[in-house]
Design a protein with these regions (language model features):
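C-terminal catalytic "cap/lid" subdomain
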Residues: 2-280
Length: 280
């Protein structure tokens, strides 16, 4: 049964694709990931938005986005699959292997680990309703046995943020949302979102060591945080509500320190997961 494959101290790490665009950064990040995985079972989810944008520009495809979320038509999806599942994922897997840690490249389509439903029309921060197209929302019922088996066998799964619906339609999935849902599904103890900012910043661009729900609502209302950070915080809050106790957004530009580093602890509302309720 699946419970035999769960691990109480799994780390799910979401890696911003902008951190691995150059060969030198890729080598450094791969080394950091290998070290982290030696200390704690680790599952990596990566994006690659900048490389998707560049490839779309080369192909003459216009980018459409709202509140940090990419609107995805057929041509945009084909580019995303090619860049994320092909170029970025393969390159990162090879680099982590070269750093001494056995890694396995996956997408959300593999064993349906990234099972998703087509996203409903989205209400923007400005109050408009837009259709996101071939964009998926990860679901809680996605099977996680493959990931648990790989982790227990000593491998580090590295997952491109491409999802799949029950009828086999590939979809673009926000990497933060996928990482958050995987953290919940795996009963991970930690979700770490690694990017190019020093966590959540205040109006003076200083890193906030900790934020709660009220802090986030105030920052959004005052227009202090960007649309991209709003999307990250939404995913982090979902992970907390799903029972992930430790959620952080950290700066990965110089190193990825899973035990510290510059960043923000997400201290939003949480619920007691079902496996813990049974103990009460």
């Amino acid at each position: 049964m699946d419970s035999m494959w769960t691990e109480p101290d799994i780390l799910v790490l979401k890696l911003g694709g902008e951190l691995i665009e150059s060969s030198s950064d890729l080598k450094r990040v791969a080394g950091d990931l290998a070290k982290a995985a030696e200390c704690q079972p680790t599952v990596v989810v990566h994006g690659g938005g900048h490389e998707i944008d560049a490839e779309m520009k080369r192909a003459g495809i216009r980018k459409q986005a709202v509140d940090g979320l990419r609107i995805t038509d057929e041509s945009t999806l084909e580019v995303a699959i090619s860049v994320l599942a092909g170029r970025v994922n393969t390159r990162l897997v090879a680099a982590v292997n070269a750093a001494g840690r056995p890694a396995v490249g996956l997408t959300g389509a593999d064993a349906e680990i990234g099972l998703a439903e087509l996203a409903p029309p989205y209400r923007t921060n400005a109050g408009h309703v837009v259709k996101l197209g071939l964009v998926g929302d990860p679901v809680a019922t996605a099977p996680h046995k493959l990931l648990s088996q790989l982790v227990h066998a000593g491998y580090t799964p590295i997952i491109a943020s491409i999802g799949v619906t029950r009828d086999g339609q590939l979809v673009n999935v926000n990497a933060d949302a996928l990482a958050a849902q995987l953290a919940v599904n795996l009963h991970a103890t930690t979700l770490m979102v690694v990017g190019t900012t020093a966590g959540v910043l205040d109006i003076d661009q200083r890193s906030l060591p900790r934020v709660n729900d009220e802090d986030i609502e105030r920052l959004v209302a005052n227009g202090v945080i960007s649309a991209g950070m709003v999307a990250k915080l939404t995913s982090c809050r979902a992970a907390r509500q799903g029972g992930v106790p430790n959620v952080r957004i950290i700066d990965g530009r110089t190193s990825i320190d899973v035990n510290g580093g510059t960043g923000t602890i997400i201290d939003t509302a949480t619920v007691v997961p079902e496996k813990e309720k049974a103990k009460l």
